[in-house]
Amino acid sequence: MDIYSATQSIKTFSTGIFPGHWLEMSKSRLYDGDISATWTLHRIVRDTLTAFSPVCPFFTDYLSTTLYGQSAVDIRAFPNLVVSGNVDVTRYLSITDDLIDFNSRIWKLKKDQGLSLKSEISKIDVPASLSDLQSSLTTMHSIV
Protein backbone atom coordinates (compact mmCIF):
# COMPACT_ATOMS: atom_id res chain seq x y z
CA MET A 1 0.00 0.00 0.00
CA ASP A 2 1.43 3.34 -1.07
CA ILE A 3 0.39 5.71 1.71
CA TYR A 4 2.59 8.54 0.36
CA SER A 5 0.67 8.91 -2.92
CA ALA A 6 -2.69 8.70 -1.16
CA THR A 7 -1.63 11.32 1.37
CA GLN A 8 -0.29 13.62 -1.35
CA SER A 9 -3.59 13.36 -3.25
CA ILE A 10 -5.58 14.30 -0.14
CA LYS A 11 -3.16 17.16 0.57
CA THR A 12 -3.34 18.43 -3.03
CA PHE A 13 -7.12 18.47 -2.89
CA SER A 14 -7.50 19.91 0.60
CA THR A 15 -4.87 22.66 0.33
CA GLY A 16 -5.04 23.48 -3.37
CA ILE A 17 -8.02 22.40 -5.44
CA PHE A 18 -10.68 22.67 -2.74
CA PRO A 19 -9.88 26.14 -1.38
CA GLY A 20 -8.72 27.59 -4.69
CA HIS A 21 -11.73 26.54 -6.72
CA TRP A 22 -14.61 24.90 -4.85
CA LEU A 23 -14.43 27.01 -1.69
CA GLU A 24 -13.78 30.20 -3.65
CA MET A 25 -16.91 29.50 -5.66
CA SER A 26 -18.97 28.99 -2.48
CA LYS A 27 -17.59 31.98 -0.59
CA SER A 28 -20.51 34.32 -1.27
CA ARG A 29 -22.97 31.66 -0.06
CA LEU A 30 -20.93 31.23 3.13
CA TYR A 31 -20.85 34.99 3.72
CA ASP A 32 -24.63 35.08 3.26
CA GLY A 33 -25.05 32.43 5.97
CA ASP A 34 -26.26 29.68 3.63
CA ILE A 35 -26.75 26.70 5.95
CA SER A 36 -26.14 24.13 3.18
CA ALA A 37 -22.83 25.71 2.21
CA THR A 38 -21.78 25.87 5.86
CA TRP A 39 -22.73 22.24 6.49
CA THR A 40 -20.86 21.13 3.36
CA LEU A 41 -17.73 23.02 4.38
CA HIS A 42 -17.74 21.44 7.83
CA ARG A 43 -18.40 18.00 6.35
CA ILE A 44 -15.42 18.33 4.01
CA VAL A 45 -13.15 19.54 6.83
CA ARG A 46 -14.30 16.74 9.14
CA ASP A 47 -13.89 14.06 6.46
CA THR A 48 -10.47 15.41 5.47
CA LEU A 49 -9.34 15.20 9.09
CA THR A 50 -10.59 11.61 9.18
CA ALA A 51 -8.67 10.75 6.01
CA PHE A 52 -5.49 12.31 7.42
CA SER A 53 -5.79 10.72 10.88
CA PRO A 54 -3.63 7.63 10.16
CA VAL A 55 -0.82 9.87 8.89
CA CYS A 56 -0.90 12.70 11.42
CA PRO A 57 -2.93 11.50 14.41
CA PHE A 58 -1.95 14.19 16.93
CA PHE A 59 -2.79 17.05 14.58
CA THR A 60 -6.10 15.56 13.46
CA ASP A 61 -7.05 14.53 17.01
CA TYR A 62 -6.56 18.07 18.31
CA LEU A 63 -8.43 19.78 15.47
CA SER A 64 -11.32 17.34 15.28
CA THR A 65 -11.79 17.24 19.06
CA THR A 66 -11.69 21.04 19.25
CA LEU A 67 -14.04 21.58 16.31
CA TYR A 68 -16.42 18.64 16.53
CA GLY A 69 -16.06 17.14 20.02
CA GLN A 70 -14.90 13.79 18.61
CA SER A 71 -11.44 12.69 17.60
CA ALA A 72 -10.91 11.82 13.94
CA VAL A 73 -8.49 9.17 15.22
CA ASP A 74 -11.44 7.28 16.75
CA ILE A 75 -13.25 6.97 13.42
CA ARG A 76 -13.07 3.36 12.23
CA ALA A 77 -14.54 3.68 8.73
CA PHE A 78 -14.16 6.17 5.92
CA PRO A 79 -17.16 8.55 5.80
CA ASN A 80 -20.09 7.59 3.59
CA LEU A 81 -21.52 9.90 0.95
CA VAL A 82 -24.51 11.71 2.41
CA VAL A 83 -27.07 13.19 0.02
CA SER A 84 -30.72 13.92 0.55
CA GLY A 85 -33.31 12.26 -1.64
CA ASN A 86 -32.41 10.80 -4.99
CA VAL A 87 -29.91 13.47 -5.98
CA ASP A 88 -27.40 12.26 -8.57
CA VAL A 89 -24.02 13.70 -7.59
CA THR A 90 -21.89 11.53 -9.87
CA ARG A 91 -21.69 14.29 -12.49
CA TYR A 92 -19.72 16.42 -10.02
CA LEU A 93 -16.98 13.80 -9.79
CA SER A 94 -15.75 14.53 -13.31
CA ILE A 95 -15.91 18.33 -13.61
CA THR A 96 -13.07 19.46 -11.35
CA ASP A 97 -10.65 19.72 -14.28
CA ASP A 98 -13.19 21.78 -16.25
CA LEU A 99 -13.70 24.03 -13.21
CA ILE A 100 -9.95 24.56 -12.77
CA ASP A 101 -9.53 25.31 -16.49
CA PHE A 102 -12.44 27.78 -16.53
CA ASN A 103 -11.30 29.60 -13.37
CA SER A 104 -7.71 29.78 -14.62
CA ARG A 105 -8.86 31.18 -17.96
CA ILE A 106 -10.96 33.90 -16.29
CA TRP A 107 -8.21 34.84 -13.80
CA LYS A 108 -5.64 35.05 -16.62
CA LEU A 109 -7.99 37.13 -18.77
CA LYS A 110 -8.55 39.61 -15.93
CA LYS A 111 -4.83 39.77 -15.16
CA ASP A 112 -3.95 40.34 -18.83
CA GLN A 113 -6.51 43.17 -18.97
CA GLY A 114 -5.18 44.73 -15.76
CA LEU A 115 -8.44 44.09 -13.91
CA SER A 116 -8.82 43.09 -10.28
CA LEU A 117 -10.36 39.69 -9.63
CA LYS A 118 -13.51 41.42 -8.30
CA SER A 119 -13.95 43.51 -11.47
CA GLU A 120 -16.94 42.80 -13.66
CA ILE A 121 -16.29 41.03 -16.93
CA SER A 122 -18.62 40.35 -19.84
CA LYS A 123 -18.87 38.16 -22.93
CA ILE A 124 -17.96 35.04 -20.96
CA ASP A 125 -19.78 31.77 -21.52
CA VAL A 126 -19.73 29.12 -18.82
CA PRO A 127 -18.96 25.73 -20.41
CA ALA A 128 -21.85 23.29 -20.72
CA SER A 129 -20.10 20.86 -18.37
CA LEU A 130 -20.30 23.52 -15.63
CA SER A 131 -23.91 24.57 -16.28
CA ASP A 132 -25.02 23.37 -12.82
CA LEU A 133 -22.51 25.82 -11.33
CA GLN A 134 -23.34 28.76 -13.60
CA SER A 135 -24.95 30.90 -10.92
CA SER A 136 -22.06 30.42 -8.49
CA LEU A 137 -19.44 31.01 -11.19
CA THR A 138 -21.23 34.14 -12.41
CA THR A 139 -21.17 35.54 -8.87
CA MET A 140 -17.59 34.42 -8.20
CA HIS A 141 -16.14 36.00 -11.33
CA SER A 142 -18.53 39.00 -11.50
CA ILE A 143 -19.70 37.98 -14.96
CA VAL A 144 -22.30 40.35 -16.40
Predicted regions, residues:
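Feature 926 captures the class I aminoacyl-tRNA synthetase adenylation module centered on the KMSKS loop
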Residues: 1-144
